């Protein structure tokens, strides 16, 4: 391969339900480190002006929190209409940024703050997925899904980390799309 990276993560997740169909999750601590163990050829990155591509191949520290909500009224072993809704919101870098600005300043010649010598990401990301199954009779159903999201980098970051970007495509189609 042209590069190698190691992904390390740690976190605490609280999950609960308040009804038969609704569930929640909260990750107050969500830490990820993307370590470029074998960086990309500098000549390759030097030939592009795409900041998103360049930042995708940097070592990054991602520390934040996330919240998720799920609603699913499909019953096992029963036919019938069903609705599935998933909402997620995630923010990273804000607590680190507040501490950095209060007590430190960026190293000379650098515009970005670091933690443990690694630039940290600062962004907000949210997404929503809604799917619906309508039984038309017997073993026939009409099924649809809508999915969308928004991600925005700010503060200490000029782009959202590659692992948090949205993309189109999959294993069977639309492979030509890029993040």
At which residue positions do the language-model features occur?
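C-terminal outer-membrane beta-barrel translocator/porin domains of Gram-negative envelope proteins
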Residues: 11-13, 21-179
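C-terminal structured domain segments across diverse proteins
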Residues: 2-3, 14-16
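Solvent-exposed loop/turn segments connecting transmembrane beta-strands
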Residues: 2-6, 96
């Amino acid at each position: 391969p042209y590069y190698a990276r190691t992904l390390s993560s740690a976190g605490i997740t609280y999950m609960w339900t308040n009804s038969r169909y609704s569930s929640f999750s909260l990750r107050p601590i969500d830490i990820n480190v993307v370590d470029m163990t074998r960086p990309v050829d500098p000549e390759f990155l030097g030939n592009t002006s795409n900041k998103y591509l360049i930042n995708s191949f940097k070592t990054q520290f991602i520390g934040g929190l996330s919240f998720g909500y799920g609603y699913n009224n499909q019953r096992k072993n029963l036919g019938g209409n069903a609705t599935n809704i998933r909402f997620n919101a995630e923010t990273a870098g804000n607590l680190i940024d507040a501490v950095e600005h209060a007590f430190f300043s960026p190293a000379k010649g650098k515009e970005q703050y670091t933690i443990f010598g690694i630039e940290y990401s600062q962004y907000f990301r949210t997404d929503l997925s809604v799917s619906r199954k309508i039984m038309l009779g017997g073993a026939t159903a009409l099924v649809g899904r809508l999915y969308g999201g928004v991600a925005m980098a700010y503060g200490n970051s000029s782009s959202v980390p590659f692992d948090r970007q949205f993309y189109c495509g999959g294993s069977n189609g639309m492979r030509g799309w890029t993040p």
